[in-house]
Amino acid sequence: MLTLIVSVVLMAVYLIFMDPILTAFGATVNAETFALSREYCFWIALGIPFYMFGQAMNPIIRSDGSPRYAMLSLLAGAVCNIILDPIFIFPCGWGMMGAAVATVLGQIVTAVLAVWYLCRMKTVKPGKGDFRLHASLCTRMLTLGITSFLSQISLVAAMAAINNMLRKYGALDEIFSQEQYAQIPMAVVGIVMKFFQIVISIVVGMAAGCIPVVGYNMGAGKKTRVRELFTKLLLCEAIVGAVALVLAEGFPRQLIAVFGAANESSYYTDFAIKAFRTYLCMMVLACVNKACFIFLQAVGKAFSSTMLSMIREVVFGMGFTLLLPRFFGLDGVLYSMPVSDVLTFVIAAVMIVKTYRELNTEGATVL
């Protein structure tokens, strides 16, 4: 119930303050893309209640002993989105609206599957009284969720800073100050961030899968197993980062083509290649850092995890995004991520060593 209330409030906020929100994230009011942004945002805002409900129910379904159903419900929504996107955009000719509607319909599919499961839960049979809000429970939920909230909101703030710096310093660039090329920097970084998010989703999925195992073994006092799991997790995350790094550095043109931008101007292609190779050059460290954030939370160090995440996104991420362009222009925005990842890894490495020492029972070697 709390999720539905919050989602409706957020939907109203997005619909009422759509223009200021888009502007805050770097959209230019007078640009022809602004109308497309408004069109997309309108439909996405309408889908917020379905999206939030589906996402909120997913961990509940997993906790009820149905992880496969939880996965399939999300997968069904994603497949629906993938199938409907080209149909709505091209044969139907709906363009940007078609992409947004396809996304919302995918979210509705996930939400409907969640409702279906809610009526057939294994361990708990919800009654009408269970949907009432209780202050103590709401407070407890908000307390437990504040860590994830701060991490996500800091990431959003960092993304807003990146977009605004791209707009500001793109306007000062010899090429991108021209109207026909003005949208290239933001479009390119958007593609780079999509690729980055795909990789990070894999990283988060692997780390999140360790949480119940860590919780069980920590509760049983089997710290040696936790340490071994941490070692294997860091190794696997580093491998994922290395594969992503090879793709970004060695095959940027192919990645651009995958995202549907193969036939753009030479300025677009050149900047995209530079963006992939520069922005993602520390991908291995980015993956290890993300795994460290989640694992610290799993072993009960929620405060350390939150602080490390906020240092990465706010102090380093936003800080260098605002600072480096003053010296390097538009390229400074691209330098901000690798610099932030290196400095974050230095701090994370200290925490990793400390965590290993705390888990270093039975005389195992400290990393």
Predicted regions mapped to residue ranges:
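Small-residue-rich hydrophobic transmembrane alpha-helices
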Residues: 1-12, 51-70, 186-246, 250-252, ...
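Short alpha-helical transmembrane segments in multi-pass integral membrane proteins
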Residues: 1-47, 91-146, 214-282, 324-367
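Juxtamembrane helix-boundary/capping and inter-helix hinge elements in multi-pass membrane proteins
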Residues: 27-32, 63-67, 169-175, 180-184, ...
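Transmembrane helix-bundle signature of multi-pass secondary active exporters and lipid flippases
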Residues: 47-51, 139, 146-217, 237-245, ...
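Short runs within selected transmembrane alpha-helices of multi-pass transporters and secretion channels
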Residues: 43-62, 70-78, 99-112, 204-207, ...
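Hydrophobic/aromatic end-of-helix segments at the C-terminal termini of transmembrane alpha-helices
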Residues: 21, 84, 157-166, 170, ...
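Alpha-helical transmembrane segments of multipass membrane proteins
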Residues: 12, 56-60, 79-87, 115, ...
